Amino acid sequence: MYAVVRLRGQVNVRYTIEDTMKMLRLHKVNHCVFVPENPHYKGMVQKVKDYVAYGKIDAKTLAEVLENRGRLEGDTRLTEEYIRENTDYDSIQAFAEAVIEGKSSLKDIPKLKPVFRLHPPRKGHAGIKRTVQQGGVLGNHDENINVLLHKMR
C-alpha cells in the first residue's frame, strides 16, 4: 500500500496533473491518501511525482496516522471503540496490520473520510523543489515515507 502526500500547491500546475491530483483526492497541501499497489494507481502516482511524496507504508505508521488524523463524517475522531463496534478487529493497530497484509481495506470502516489532513512536518521539509535523490522530499521515498509521516503526525 502506498501513502501519497501532496507537498506542493496548485499554482501553475498543468491541467492533466491537477486532474490526476483530483482523482487521487489530493486537493490541498499536506493532504494524504493511501492507495493500493496496482498498475493503475502506480501510473497516477508516477504522473504527479513532482508534486507529492510517496512510498510504501508500514503497519505501525498506518496505525499512528489513523489514530491521530483519522476522521469520520461529521469531523469526529476515529477511536478504538468505533473500530471494535464496526469492524472485526479489536484495535486500530490490528486493523492497520490487516490492511497492510491485504486482508482488509480502509473502506471497511464505515463513514471514514478517505483523506487525512496532516500537520506540516516538524523541523520542516528538506526542500519541496527537489527530489529525494537531490536532497529534497519530492518523489519516491520507499520505506522512508514512514519517517515523513511521523514528522507530519
UniProtKB/Swiss-Prot annotation:
Alphabetical list of SUPFAM superfamilies matching this protein: Ribosomal protein L30p/L7e (SSF55129)
One GO term (biological process): translation
Recorded GO CC terms: cytosolic large ribosomal subunit
GO MF annotation, one: RNA binding
Keywords, in A-Z order: Ribonucleoprotein, Ribosomal protein
Keyword Ribosomal protein included in the entry's annotation: yes
Assembly and binders: Part of the 50S ribosomal subunit.
Family: Belongs to the universal ribosomal protein uL30 family.
Name of the protein this chain belongs to: Large ribosomal subunit protein uL30
Species for this entry: Methanosarcina acetivorans (strain ATCC 35395 / DSM 2834 / JCM 12185 / C2A)
This protein's encoding gene: rpl30
